[in-house]
């Protein structure tokens, strides 16, 4: 009897993850900071940068940019570069798409928490991110 439901084995081992760059800017006066926290336009942009470190390791950066505006005024800009350093477990068969998807699965939960906390502590609308659709993500090699 054979099992047709093969278990997926991860192709990457997370060695380290950390904030590479973080920026939160509030270009407006305090009067806009204290305004009602509803009816804002929030624009999110995600991208992934993958760079081979050597034949066994890869560095992947998840970039998240968030701009919040109200009535054509920028309330805040939040940018996060969250880096992961990974060991390739199956060097021969691993492709760039697999690296990107697995790396983002490792990095996104922590990046999501950082975005949430920074936006909340910045005094504005709290940004709560949902799971990413990795097929729509822009990849930069």
Q: Could you describe each region identified by the protein language model?
A:
Residues 1-141:
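N-terminal intrinsically disordered, cationic/polar leader segments
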């Amino acid at each position: 009897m054979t099992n047709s439901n093969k278990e997926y084995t991860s192709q990457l081992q997370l060695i380290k993850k950390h904030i590479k760059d973080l920026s939160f800017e509030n270009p407006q006066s305090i009067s806009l900071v204290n305004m009602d926290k509803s009816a804002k336009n929030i624009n999110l942009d995600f991208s992934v940068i993958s760079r081979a470190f050597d034949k066994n390791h890869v560095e992947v950066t998840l970039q998240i940019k968030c701009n919040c505006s109200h009535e054509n005024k920028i309330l805040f800009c939040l940018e996060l570069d969250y880096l992961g350093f990974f060991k390739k477990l199956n060097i021969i068969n691993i492709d760039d798409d697999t690296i990107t998807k697995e790396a983002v699965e490792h990095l996104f939960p922590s990046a999501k928490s950082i975005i949430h906390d920074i936006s909340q502590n910045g005094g504005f609308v709290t940004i709560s991110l949902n799971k990413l659709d990795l097929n729509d993500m822009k990849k930069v090699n």
